[in-house]
């Protein structure tokens, strides 16, 4: 147990160091390598409200700031096309990419005009699974990933997501209604919340199997230097021994046995 905790600490420290970004002197990307496939990642860093556990690059949504940002994204896409880059796959992450649905659609349409795009992937939140948005995303996005995190109302309240995105039951119903609009609808979940019990974890797995999604991704709750204090105030202190135990429970329920709910990919 002690050796595992030490290894976890070392790996997390190395990851933090590796992922620290520094300015580069170049003012343009290197030219594309002929014959090499490329994927375009588009980051939309805006959220309507910021979750206390999230350590990704994100900012509170302001309409004009977001529109200026999307315009800059599209200009950079034109620069990439002029430089000779081509992309068959586009992934839009955040933040909340659907925070300004019309700007997102315009950006995706431009990507398809500039490049030979075969597939677009995007993230979203449950409150954007509404007919108006789904109609606009249908055909533009093939694979949608919905940040659910948990169907448990108690955990949703702790995460400050209950009022923003609805109850677990409401989210469950929205996923079922949204799934037919996409080739693949993924549900993003988090495990190892300090107050999460095995019963809550198992209940989340059962709801995933029944909600109509095509796949699911479970990630352990990640604590960064930027979020540690806020997370401990709001959610409590993390237990990495429980994280390991919960991982094995998830692996057995979702991908183990003779009739697994999902095919294990990673």
PLM features: residue spans?
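Flexible, acidic/Gly-rich N-terminal and inter-domain linker regions that tether
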Residues: 1-40, 48-49
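C-terminal accessory regions of radical SAM enzymes
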Residues: 250-266
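Divalent metal-dependent hydrolysis catalytic cores, especially in the metallo-beta-lactamase
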Residues: 39, 52, 93
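Local cysteine-cluster metal-coordination motifs and their immediate loop/turn environment
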Residues: 42-58
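Short, charged low-complexity linear motifs
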Residues: 34, 41, 249-253
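Short beta-strand motif preference
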Residues: 40-42, 146
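Conserved non-cysteine loop/helix-boundary elements of the Radical SAM core domain that shape
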Residues: 58-83, 88-250
């Amino acid at each position: 147990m002690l050796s595992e905790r030490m290894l976890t600490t070392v790996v997390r420290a190395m990851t933090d160091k590796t992922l620290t970004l520094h300015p580069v002197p170049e003012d343009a990307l290197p030219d594309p390598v002929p014959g090499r496939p490329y994927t375009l990642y588009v980051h939309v860093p805006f959220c309507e409200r910021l979750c206390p556990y999230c350590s990704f690059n994100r900012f509170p949504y302001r309409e004009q700031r977001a529109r200026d940002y999307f315009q800059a994204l599209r200009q950079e896409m034109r620069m990439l096309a002029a430089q000779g880059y081509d992309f068959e796959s586009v992934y839009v992450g955040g933040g909340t990419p659907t925070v300004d649905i019309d700007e997102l659609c315009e950006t995706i349409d431009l990507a398809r005009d500039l490049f030979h795009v075969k597939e677009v992937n995007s993230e979203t939140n449950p409150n954007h699974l509404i007919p108006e948005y789904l109609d606009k995303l249908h055909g533009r996005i093939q694979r949608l990933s919905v940040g659910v995190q948990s169907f448990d109302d108690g955990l949703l309240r702790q995460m400050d997501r209950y009022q923003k995105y609805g109850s677990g039951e409401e989210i469950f119903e929205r996923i079922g209604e949204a799934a037919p609009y996409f080739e693949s609808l993924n549900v993003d979940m988090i495990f190892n919340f300090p107050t999460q019990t095995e019963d809550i974890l198992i209940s989340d797995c059962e709801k995933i199997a029944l909600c109509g999604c095509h796949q699911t991704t479970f990630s352990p709750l990640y604590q960064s230097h930027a979020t540690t204090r806020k997370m401990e105030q709001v959610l409590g202190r993390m237990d990495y021994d429980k994280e390991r135990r919960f991982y094995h429970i998830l692996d057995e329920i979702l991908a183990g046995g003779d009739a697994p709910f999902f095919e294990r990919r990673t």
